[in-house]
Regions:
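Compact, glycine-rich, soluble single-domain proteins
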Residues: 1-76
Length: 76
């Protein structure tokens, strides 16, 4: 199933299909190694749900929900 990265449940994994963010954010994500084909896991979500910690390639980063909505993944 394909969905936005923001729809992954805690502990769920997905493979990045495309990143439709602005150029600046896309460049920062690519520098961390978040590119199409990357396996990503949802690790933590703040109580309000506005920020989520994601783990991929041995790295953990936090992204805002509005940015995650622009990243398409295939759920595993």
């Amino acid at each position: 199933m394909e969905t936005g990265l923001d729809c992954l449940r805690l502990g769920q994994k997905g493979t990045v299909l495309e990143i439709n963010t602005d150029q600046s954010l896309r460049g920062r994500l690519q520098a961390f190694g978040l590119i199409p084909g990357t396996l990503v896991c949802c690790r933590y979500r703040t109580p309000g749900g506005s920020v989520t910690a994601l783990e991929f390639r041995g790295t953990v980063i936090a992204l805002r929900t509005r940015d995650m909505q622009k990243i398409r993944v295939r759920c595993l």
